């Protein structure tokens, strides 16, 4: 695979203290979010100038996605997001969190976004609370993506 960009030539003359960390994301659950945070922390100790995050995912849990976004936002090293295969649902939101100029999609890849889904059940009040939370999460992820894409807050909804 070959990616091109207008990257600073100094990046090519990089000396690493350890093997670079490359993060692969194929699901969004508590375990993968924890692993993601650990690998982001490891990457800060390698001397690498960019943290590549390769996404090939159908999506998953929004709360786990939010944890991954927090790890990216707190990174002192630029994060490149690369889609191979697919970035659907949570995957496309995470893709948008890569630093500007460091978001890449292979020509064979597919991106797909949709509203947050919920499996609400229970008493009327519980269903209403779940619907309210689903609406809040949906608005939040669309605003994150709009901000990352330099669009108005309500661009995606």
Regions found by a protein language model. Give the residues of each.
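Terminal-region recognition feature
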Residues: 1-157
